[in-house]
């Protein structure tokens, strides 16, 4: 459109003007020319500053009073609307209508005040440069004949878009750098009068140095135009009006209104400055008001759909437009109103006005950009625990909200990876990508599509919470009230929209089509038709479903009604019936009561049928301990999972010393899954969710499923054989401990205790664990490992309530209220269906909080001292009391001098008889006969090694005597019973014994004080033993008990009780007194028994006289005596000792010798070879005993061997025994062949890190495959190894707590004392000790391996140690068979 035909008004951005009340602050250039001559376009001065580099950041708006012009000047009466358009070079529409009001309207509008403020909204320079100077047109149009109209400036947002920035406002070169100074970019002046502004004045202001750069000025008049210097001619002044008047419907729906920042529109809606109802663009944060929260929808804004580019529409203002109301401008920060004439500050690019620079600086800038998850686009700005990962080949990092989003993004970036995740579908059998995985009956089924998933659900009868309309999965309690009851069936929906769609469509959705087709084919279901009839809940009338009115019923579900009146009437009836209390007091059902019962306490109970009455009567026979009746309905338990109350027998879960109760098995299983209650299954040895814990022989065994429990029961019963029974009292599977016949029925029990308790329960002598009443106990439950019996379910529930909340009134009960007064006090009065007059309700009692101040008093206690009379030394009755105090001599003890004020010790001599040896001189002829007697003994060579050794020592003694015979022939000492008295110097008990002698106790018996806890193994349990106890060795015959003579019977005439009592296993301290006392008992019995028979292999022509004092014997004598001792020792009652008991006694003798400074080691030294052979024969016949829990019983423990130095690194043999013991215990080597497979090349040191403490520890590692080889019968099997194809690695962990008993330290010491060339050999591990080596020598061992016989002897002793069976339990090991 030609600009010459209209008078256009254009706002310039950078036109400097003088600040003053007399100047009209306007940028309307060449206004006078438009009135005096033809219409000329307004000259825009923005081109002058188009490429200016002035960094303007803020605008200043001056609000000043406007002077009214003289009334003689004609008034422009049309509403002038000034708009900011976002498009460049917009042409005015030619079809715009002209507004021609009548003269009356013009006269009525004369003098009216119309005040509007124009604020330009500047954007960033980056989007504005390069645009034309007229990209934003301030257009004003009016008909030529219109003269008396007021000017109205309106910012219409219909053509305002943030995406296309107003070039007219932003081409001034204002920068948006954050460090730029705050400068003025816009000034708006409101004045009451308009003065002339010429071009000369505007040009003169260009060169001024102003602190506040004024780049834009807009003048708004509120009265008639005053005198202008060039004169105004209204006939030639035309205003082009481009307006948009939305319809009433569009304004109401979208909330579009005029853009009046900081003012109130005509409708009265509040808009703070800078607000716009339609700023739905990426920069919408600019228009957020400080008076409204940023996360709250502002009034008039219903939708947030962006309207970035709206079409240019021509809207016509109505002829009868009312003038706008006066508005008020407020500060965006402090909300103070801005007065006229006050300077207002404005930030570039923002529509907010501020009263001062302080408010401008303190006002929050653009908020921090939101961080979104790359995959799901979720806001993760404030989220903790986000994941930053570099997922592609580039170096950029992406941020995700969770690991699932990261996985999905990686799969999306790598589509080839998803091709590898193909499996075969369980339903259709296709090899494709899997969408669903269902874990059902301990198996994972993979399904490729929803169709296969629905077919799988229907085939297995699985019920899932899915929306009936869209098929979305619903949680158990997340459906809310979105439930419809149609023909008695509940249909669940995810939201209300799905409910509406379901009611409108009336048919099933597409995702259930396959399921419905399958059900129709299988069960001949009739398909539901569109618009089916539904029964009204109130009047039971058949109506179409989509015509029904839905309402939430009393049960929480949506119920259909035919009309609102029917719904209200049904609610009224239900409210009346609900107030009557028709809930059955027994089954809790909402039904019409058929029976009523009046209780002794005046309460009225309702019942739905006779069955509930009978059950209630049976329960009401029980009374509470205080004699008051307690109704069963008053006892409610709370489920620990769903938090619902219930009054049935609970499901119990005992975990971590806490007992949890649940209303059903389902809640119990869900609770285990939710709280991750996992444990190692006793059968499959895998960590899974706990299914059940069952007692086996008193030991709790956890299982992951019912199948593992049954399989373990079968294995357990197969191990115990015929002795495996189920206890009739505690119901555990165990070995038969007791049997009782009751009324002709033989019942088995695990112990005598269970037998006695069952007998009490059977004869109704047991008491209820809740009310303490005797009688018939119908209910029982296992509580914390004990069986609890109760009268009925009522007492059972009370017991659980007491465990949850202890009630002191229920802790004690009467002796027997059941048979005394319980029946009389709990009788009910049946009145049929007619209700009796309601009794007076009892007064409701509530707890009342009262402000009470406690009264405190101080109580003093007076203690009167008790006076006693004490005599002193001045009295006549004083007498000195002598107390004997033994003091060892010649130790000197200083005696303090108290000047006779206290008692002092006085030394007193006591004569003690001391035996003195007397040396009698022998005649010459007698001494000459001694060598002849020695030669005669030598001629009688005996096959016994002991006799030969004794003869050798005798010969040595005779040679020493022969040397001294020439000097002093009278000093020859003759002993007829024992020879070699010079060897006794190392065993003098008077000088070197540091352990006290043990007094003889004839009744002391190790097997009585430390009894066995189980019977020995029989033939059916021989498979539990390692081969060393079975086929590798033949059982050695044990000598029978010999008949006692008269003297022996006199000595051992006492009798002791049998050791067959079933006592539980306990830790028994090691005492050497048992071994020393057994030696004395054997020596005393041997001396008294004249008819004692010796074994054939130990017969000799010369006997050694044995003494009760062990320290008085030489090495040869002890070897001889101990060899006889282990074969002839008997218990005080005449029975044989068990092999482990004999080994225990010998260990006690060894400790006594070591404690008495005797250097002999009866188990290692070569001088005790005969004793070692006899002991090994006896130990080979040992058969281990199995305890009820499946462990091995033995009286020998590992700590005993360390105490008596059988294990350690102090000698070569002890170090070998230590390595042999550790390999047997930790590597599980139970046969000689397994030990022979060990070598230096297969055992190596390894560092292992603890995952909890992150600490490195050394360990010895050994691979099982190297042990197993090709011998299947010698495979090492442990409890943790369940698959034969696995090759577990056995380790010996470093003992940092006690380095002296560390396996790794012992192995390093063994390597250091071995030859260096043997470290990598694969055929030897146990080396032969050097005969001449000492403890200080660098090498203790030779390169020769130990022979098999020595290893067998070592293994026999090691297998008697109880500690080696702690890890590998042979009774309960599944792989031993």
UniProtKB/Swiss-Prot annotation:
- Biased composition regions of type Polar residues, renumbered to the chain: 85-115, 127-138, 153-164, 284-298
Q: Where in the cell is it found?
A: Nucleus
The residues annotated as site (Breakpoint for translocation to form ZMYM2-FGFR1) are: 913-914
Phosphothreonine is carried by which residues?
Answer: 1376
Q: What is its main location?
A: nucleus
The reply to whether Glycoprotein figures as a keyword in the UniProt entry is no
- What keyword terms does UniProt attach to this protein? Chromosomal rearrangement, Disease variant, Intellectual disability, Isopeptide bond, Metal-binding, Nucleus, Phosphoprotein, Repeat, Transcription, Transcription regulation, Ubl conjugation, Zinc, Zinc-finger
Q: Is Zinc-finger there in the keyword field? A: yes
Top-rank lineage group of the source organism: Eukaryota
Name the record gives this protein: Zinc finger MYM-type protein 2
Instruction: List the Gene Ontology MF annotations in alphabetical order.
Output: ubiquitin conjugating enzyme binding; zinc ion binding
Positions in coiled-coil regions: none
Q: Which SMART domains match?
A: TRASH
Pfam family of the protein (one): DUF3504
Q: Where is the composition biased (Basic residues)?
A: 1039-1050
Specify the species.
Homo sapiens
